[in-house]
Amino acid sequence: MEIDQCLLESLPLGQRQRLVKRMRCEQIKAYYEREKVFQKQEGPLKRSKPGKRQKVRFGLADMIQDAVIHHHDKEVLQLLKEGADPHTLVSSGGSLLHLCARYDNVFIAEVLIDRGVNVNHQDEDFWTPMHIACACDNPDIVLLLILAGANVFLQDVNGNIPLDYAVEGTESSAILLAYLDEKGVDLSSLRQIKLQRPLSMLTDVRHFLSSGGDVNEKNDDGVTLLHMACASGYKEVVLLLLEHGGDLNGTDDRYWTPLHLAAKYGQTTLVKLLLAHQANPHLVNCNGEKPSDIAASESIEEMLLKAEIAWEEKMKESPSAPSLAQEELYEILHDLPDLSSKLSPLVLPIAKQDSLLEKDIMFKDTTKGLCKQESQDGPPETSMTSNCGKPEQVQVMPPAPSDDLATLSELNDSSLLYEIQKRFGNDQIHTFIGDIFLLVNPFKELPIYSTMVSQMYLSPTGQRSPSLPPHLFSCAERAFHRLFQERKPQNIILSGERGSGKTQASKQIMKYLTSRASSSCTMFDSRLRHAIYIVEAFGHAKTTLNNVSSCLIQYWELQCCQRRKHITGARISTYMLEKSRVVAQPPGQGTFLIFSWLMDGLSSEEKCGLHLNNFCAHRYVSQGMREDVSTAEHSLNKERLAALKHALNVIGFSTLEVENLFVILSAILHIGDIQFTALTEADSAFVSDLQLLEQVAGMLQVSTDELASALTTDIQYFKGDVIIRRHTIQMAAFYRDLLAKSLYSRLFGFLINTVNCCLQNQDEYKSLQTLDIGILDIFGFEEFQKNEFEQLCVNLTNEKMHHYIQEVLFLQEQTECVQEGVAMETACSPGNQAGVLDFFFQKPSGFFSLLDEESQVIWSGEPNLPRKLQGLLESSNTNAVYSPVKDGNGNVAFKGQGAAFTVMHYAGRVMYEMGGAVERNKDSLSQNLLFVMKTSENVVISHLFQSKLSQTGSLISSYPSFKFGGHKSTLLSKRTASSMVGVNKNYLELSKLLKKKGTSTFLQRLERGEPATAASQLTKSLADITAKLQRGSPHFILCIKPNTSQLPGVFDHFYVSAQLQYLGVLGLVRLFRSGYPVRPSFEDFLSRYEPLASVLLGETKGQAAEERCRLVLQRCKLQGWQIGVHKVFLKYWHVDQLSDLWLQLQRKIVTCQKVIRGFLARQHLLQRMSIKQQEVTSIKSFLQSTEDMALKTYDALVIQNASDIAREHDRLRKEVHTAYHRNRQEEGTKRAEDQGGCRHVHSNSVPVPMVVDSLAQALTGPSTRPPSLHSVFSMDDSTGLPSPRKQPPPKPKRDPNTRLSASYEAVSACLSAAKDAAGEALTRPRPHSDDYSTMKKIPPRKPKRSPHTKLSGSYEEIWGPPRPSGTMGQGGRHQAPGTLSVQWARPDSVPQCTPQLPLHLPLPQGDYDDDAEPVYIEMVGNAARAGGSETDSPDQGESVYEEMKYILPEEGCGLGMLTFLPASPPLFLETRKAIILEAAEGNCQPSKDTCDIPPPFPNLLPHRPPLLVFPPTPVTRSPASDESPLTPLEVKKLPVLETNLKYPVQSEGSSPLSPQYSKAQKGDNDQLASPGFPVFNGPSRISPPATPPPPPGPPPAPCGPPPAPCGPPPAPCGPPPAPCGPPPAPCGPPPAPCGAASASCGVAPAPCRPPTHFAFPPESVLVTAAKALTNSDLPRTQPKPSSAPVPGPCSSFVKAPYSPGKTARADLRKTSSTFSPPSPYSPPNSRPLSSPLDELASLFNSGRSVLRRSAVGRRIREAEGFETNMNLSSRDEPSSSEMASETQDRNANNHGTQLSSSLSSDVTAENGNPVTNGLAEDDGCSRLCLSGMGTSSFQRNRESHTTQVIHQLRLSENESVALQELLDWRRKLCEAREGWQEALQHPEPRAPPPPPCKKPTLLKKPEGGSCTRLPSQLWDSSM
């Protein structure tokens, strides 16, 4: 069972331990099972005897490696004697010397070096023993390797040298730095050395590429140059390879890509670079690992995971989409430093952590032990935090002239003191001295540090505002801005006495900076406050000078991101903790605050558990315990302890860990109570209280015996020999106290490291370049009655800081002025600080050097320090340090056995007594005590003593700043090395080693071998602090203490004056007034003010830097500056003035950039708009070209249809001319019988609308064959596709209003000439299989008509009020058992957008008889779905009629289905298939056996359309909201040309053969109409109610102006459908017509889909005609916006324009008050006809010639704006125009007779015969006539009209000549027109034509008109 290491690390500790235990048990179990099986397989013969021991022999190489690891030195020597090879390699490729460096075996390492082992041997990762020794911090090995000649410049695979792995502050790092300094190598030259390898490879790659080498060339392992560069981190090489086309995703033989290698070896910059160049993060290597799986750090892993997500999104989108934000990536790549090679301190491996946790008996509940709790952002619950619950107060004093003391006119000590005292009395505690800030501690809380005040001091430049007084926030703001201006660290240095307010000032500065520049202000600010509180509890004490006195040096570093300019983290470094205060406190002073808080804050139960029942009895706290502590103080300490617990929880300590900390603190107190006694005469110490010792050992979790032995004896190991030495009582007490101090010091270091880990922002990438703002807070100068070694260290620290301030402010300026030749007005004496510091810190003759020498002595009975100190005082040349007591002869008299001296500090004279200084200086535990504490089972204690100390005495952090997963250094844990060392570890004496190797200058300067002492730690701490300060720019804050009693409002003049004098405030004022505090070099000046210089100087590259600086200062008009040899000398106010000028320039630059960016953005927008306009133009051009092709096809079909008509007429006239007059009644009966029976579908409930289709309704598309006459009549309005199922029924009755031909004889006679030229296409027989093609063309007898038969195309009748329930077909008693019913729903019973469509076709029962006239209805097909062309379909002209066959629907399609009632077997197919209503997009694909025929007829061939026969029905109308789920049904009326009809004026350019098509109204979307049922076209055509209709509402008009309403407006059905995209251009033969079957039939609840037909009219003039409402057959209601679907999604079938027959009119027969407003124009002679058969019967039964004279195309030949017939009706009654009745023809087709406003009172007729417009009757109940005549009058008008038409047709003698003339005129008309394409592009609406006034000449082209109808090339009679 194997588990990934990352998985174990992610689990909680408790769960992880349980999992590990279970794994361990399973492994043991599996091991025993395997052994049992193995024993069974071996058999009983091979089993060993029970008592016999087996011997296992290992090789010498394995044995010597194990001996080196476990420090078995004798065994190693024995193995080497036996022949073991000292050059043996380990598994990683390293030598035995690598193992010695790993496990700190110095003795064997020396032996191996003597045997000739290579000290520079490199393993597989190029690590040398020096690398490992530095990573594990083994300084003995480091020194040994250096002395053996190891090369410290060798680089590993990552390009790191050994120094890069040495943790800063460790002894190994100090040794290497000293060695490099000895060799003269500084850090800059070291960087050049590290860059030699990448520069060498860069040169080689350039040469290789210039010589024509392949950039992707691979070696034997498939590795390319890009692989090598990415693994090594050579950014320049990678960029070069990428520029030359390096393969980003190239793989080697193991399928590793360059991204894999860059991620594995932690090359963060290269990972970003590869991802920016579109490297694929999803590629896997041979192990199936992606780059994110092997990433070396969490930041790289997070980056790769984001890249993987972006790559997946890129794959989903277009290929051009980038995988990452390129701008962001390259922004990250700019100004990024190389990956820091400094590795963090190493951590315990997870196995070691689990091992220690299992041993830890303190943590019973390990599931909570080390689990970090969520950080709580609340402040510490203590009264020390001011104004927590109080409202925020703001108190800002107005500015005063004394805000800057440097501007005072009178300058002396008294004037300075007076100004400071005056300001202090006004609570103005802040004052400026130039750039130096002066702070006076008020000893009270002032409301000047609130958040509102901090907002007031925010500045864009960091300059002091003249309207605000001096403030601490202003100083912090200036430091923050200079951080980014100078791009170097800034240091804020606070100095002053104890109690002067340094710590509080530093806290306010950090609070301001974090709130101003923190990215997550609340979280970080809260953590920082809690961290400060923890440092205060463990690092501060209560003294007589200050209640919260700092006992250490704090250096806070706030890390700011240079690019984002916000704080990313913080870090605290502590120095010189007064750990001696734990065991002994000066008189009147207390111990650390934490012990006081524990005493007052712990409960009784907690004290009992910690054995602290009598807290005051402990020796460590009883010395400084104050007896006058009030009850309020105890309560306050309890609150402070609770706040401390909360703060520890915030930074990551759990409750159990906090309790463990308190156990350690309690153990420290109990350690101080251990007493020793002497039981023998040798004065050997023994523990007197064994019970207390056992109690302490239990708290420390160590062995009692081992602890007692470690306290009383000293055990040392030397080459296998054990040396034991007993301690005396004095020595035992010393080591006891030293253990307590060391334990507290290490615990404090552990807390500091935890705080630093918490304050590090883990979300920020560690490769981001940061700048630091340092805040230095040192313990203040102090003087007591008795000053000892601790006070000396404190005051020397202040002396050093004061000397640094004086050196920076005075000495450096004086020196630079002299060097640069600049005169300085005042000079400052350096004082005697240099002499004081030299006396103590000079080497090797300084006092601290003497003290360290004395501390090296193990134990001396007679101290030698007083004698040595006397010699030092006598030899010293300084007067700053001298002997305190001298007799009359001048001899020094010492007090007792101690040593004393007096020091003249900068702050005054202080005498120190050095008694016991040697013991206090010692700071190193014995090896025996150290080993006992390392073996503690307490995790924290074991960790504290296994960690090493830095040279400054701080605990080296074990928390990594960033992790490198899988990196080799994580395997080299120094703590595991220490823990594996046994008790027999041999410690080689350094002196012998040095004697053996010899002395050298390096060893003398190294000064190694000294024990860790307080003096050495102080020296190195001050050196470290000074080095940090020198790296940045200083900002000084001088803190003044007003009195020694800590009383608010008290100002002690003498005390304050003394502080002003030794701080040198007067000298600082004079310096800033006359000196030059700002002294940048020429290059730094030009770099800092580069924008200003570039604008002021322009192109001055040839000038010297000095001259350029001079010009800049002159043009800025500054005064008082000077130019030196290499530097510019400026006053402190010059910086603010230059910053103001730079800010003004920056604002102007920003304004210019804003304007330019706006201009570019507008240009980009215009470019995008231009591109979009081009796309729109291209689409329009495509649509126009498609429309032109459709028009060409349309014109060709017109000619072909005319030829077919002529041919067919010639044949029929010869066959049935005589029988036509004799047997019309018998033939009608015969035809009804042939099509009757079960094959006829008779509808008694659905008034089938008749659609008058003309030749203009032909398909717009190319045709392979000329369609026949019947195919012409079956053209679809909406799509223009010829449908084979939309053929007209045989011999329908004609309406005289149909203006094409009066009879087939007339058409045949007119088109006889075209028959000869048509070719084969015209001579083919007509492809009809029914009796229509074979019957004699004798008009059938007129069938009996029922007055209830309303088979009309008028919308008013279709959408009229519903019939009574007794006449509805859905009533069961009136329906035949074998009939098909169509059930319509009421429009008001369903929602407008989702009407119910239970569509049935009921057959009549009672009203049906054999004599009822059948109506033939054709099903509109959907052959061409989705606009595709069916090239392999049968010829569209070869159409054969076939009866309709119905099938039952079945579920499965989301669209609406047609449901049928039970019908007779002949009506249905055996296979029941779902009737799917095709949507416009054709989502539901047809079955493969249905070909082009829609689903209702799956077994019909494409050329055999179905034919429906409907019997008469008494129903007047159907509900307006229903639509049939069947494909639209159409009743075809054959067009009739009559000469006695008055035609309206033809629109310009319309076709002579398509008058009705030209009047087709286009809808809102300018789409063609569907000739199907109006009920299928949506619910917008509603019938008027029985009562007068309400005023019409606004009709939906999404695309164009709607026609004039002719009735109540349609109910809105939702928003109009979105227009569909452009259809593909037709290529090839036209597809089978889909017409209104799919595109315009809105019966299915399908989603909004665009239609498959063309979304544009066949001619642009039709748009004009439709919008202008010039046609006579326009609908009287608004066009429907959408069809009415069934409940479900709102059907949004794009509506198609409707044919002239589908017009909605009000049902005028219901009530006399129901009228529609007049339409602009309407044919006056239109009259009601019952059915197409009635029309034919009335036409052919007359027996006369149908064409009387050559006037068949009279309307077409009329010019625009004129009428052929000038005869007006004699009826001038006003009622005729007001009522504006609508008539019906004999087919029940309503034709509006309403006239325009100019002709409202005139009804035209031809030849002077007035035609009365009668109305149809409704069940004999009510009639409405315009003239007020009765039914008989209406009948006479109708009969007389028919008689006139037939009579005029019979008078025609030469019909063929007339029609031939018509065709010739049309051909010439189109050939003569050239710019017909341009005319299509201007479909503006036109005004209605004027009333007729003149009859034009026959076949004369109108003046000024242009035929935009047909191209000339299509007018060919041969087609």
Curated annotation (Swiss-Prot):
Stretches the record annotates as Disordered: 371-398, 1218-1245, 1259-1299, 1316-1377, 1544-1642, 1672-1734, 1759-1818, 1877-1919
Sequence ranges of Polar residues compositional bias: 1547-1559, 1672-1681, 1776-1812, 1909-1919
Start-end of Basic residues biased regions: 1338-1348
Annotated IQ domain residues: 1145-1174
Superkingdom of the organism of origin: Eukaryota
Pro residues composition-biased segments: 1585-1633, 1717-1726
A molecular function GO annotation: cytoskeletal motor activity
Expression across tissues: Expressed predominantly in brain where it is present in the neurons, but not in astrocytes or oligodendrites.
CDD domains noted in UniProt: MYSc_Myo16
Keyword Cytoplasm: yes
Function according to Swiss-Prot or TrEMBL: Myosins are actin-based motor molecules with ATPase activity. Unconventional myosins serve in intracellular movements. Their highly divergent tails are presumed to bind to membranous compartments, which would be moved relative to actin filaments. May be involved in targeting of the catalytic subunit of protein phosphatase 1 during brain development. Activates PI3K and concomitantly recruits the WAVE1 complex to the close vicinity of PI3K and regulates neuronal morphogenesis.
Subunit structure: Binds PPP1CA and/or PPP1CC. Binds F-actin in an ATP-sensitive manner. Interacts with ACOT9, ARHGAP26 and PIK3R2. Interacts with components of the WAVE1 complex, CYFIP1 and NCKAP1; this interaction mediates PI3K-WAVE1 association and actin cytoskeleton remodeling. Interacts with KIRREL3.
Protein name: Unconventional myosin-XVI
Encoding gene, per UniProt annotation: Myo16
